[in-house]
Curated annotation (Swiss-Prot):
Transmembrane segments: none annotated. GO terms for molecular function: small ribosomal subunit rRNA binding; structural constituent of ribosome. This is Small ribosomal subunit protein bS18. It comes from the Bacteria. GO terms for cellular component: cytosolic small ribosomal subunit. The keyword Ribosomal protein applies. It comes from Salinispora arenicola (strain CNS-205). One of its GO terms (biological process) is translation. The keyword rRNA-binding applies. Gene3D superfamilies: Ribosomal protein S18. Belongs to the bacterial ribosomal protein bS18 family.
């Protein structure tokens, strides 16, 4: 029984940006960017979010721009 579970393929993550039809990631869209930030304020990894590498770079750039413009916090406020 354990062998059958080990042979099972993991389910592929659905790309949330492709699902919603989003082609351009804007730094002013904080509602979208918050989906890709952890509760600690870190940018989530590709393997967690399911986006492509190009989209991940665009998200990272948009989050950094939004932080610079004070639209997103650099770190979480909770301790």
């Amino acid at each position: 029984m354990a062998k059958a579970a080990a042979l099972r393929k993991p389910k592929k993550k659905v790309n949330p940006l492709d699902k919603d039809g989003i082609t351009y990631i804007d730094y002013k869209d904080t509602a979208l960017l918050r989906k890709f930030i952890s509760d600690r304020g870190k940018i989530r990894a590709r393997r967690v979010t399911g986006v492509t590498s190009q989209q991940q770079r665009q998200i990272a750039r948009a989050v950094k721009n939004a932080r610079e413009m004070a639209l997103l916090p650099y770190t979480a406020t909770a301790r």
